Amino acid sequence: MIRMDTVTDLSLREIGVAATKVLGRAVEVRAESHIGRDLAVDSLALMNIIMELEDTFDISIPLDRLASVETAGDLSKLINDLRTRA
């Protein structure tokens, strides 16, 4: 059985990979990292990161679900929720 913390770690790592690719700079992502403040991601960059993550995980992230996402941990949880429903 796959442990949930392993799945979360994978999601956080992939969020970092996507953010690094989109932003063109190294990004250290932790669960508590605030997407706008700590990662310095604006709304356009966030949408590009979301598209990268959708491709990586073969999921579709509804825009209305993003309204509650403030931290990388929130985004990781959303990804994991969508992956378990797919």
UniProtKB/Swiss-Prot annotation:
Q: Which Pfam families match?
A: PP-binding
Q: Which UniProt keywords apply?
A: Lipid metabolism, Phosphopantetheine, Phosphoprotein
Q: Function of this protein?
A: Involved in de novo bacterial ceramide synthesis.
User: Which residues belong to any copy of the Carrier domain?
Assistant: 6-83
Family membership noted in the UniProt record: Belongs to the acyl carrier protein (ACP) family.
List modified residues, type O-(pantetheine 4'-phosphoryl)serine. 43
This one is known as Probable acyl carrier protein CCNA_01221
Recorded hits in InterPro entries, A to Z, give: ACP-like_sf, PP-bd_ACP
Report the Gene3D superfamilies cross-referenced here.
ACP-like
Which Gene Ontology CC terms are recorded?
membrane
Q: What happens when the gene is disrupted?
A: Deletion mutant cannot form bacterial ceramide. Mutants are impaired in growth at elevated temperatures but are resistant towards the antibiotic polymyxin B.
GO biological process terms held by the UniProt record = sphingolipid metabolic process
Q: Which SUPFAM superfamilies match?
A: ACP-like (SSF47336)
Pathway note: Lipid metabolism; sphingolipid metabolism
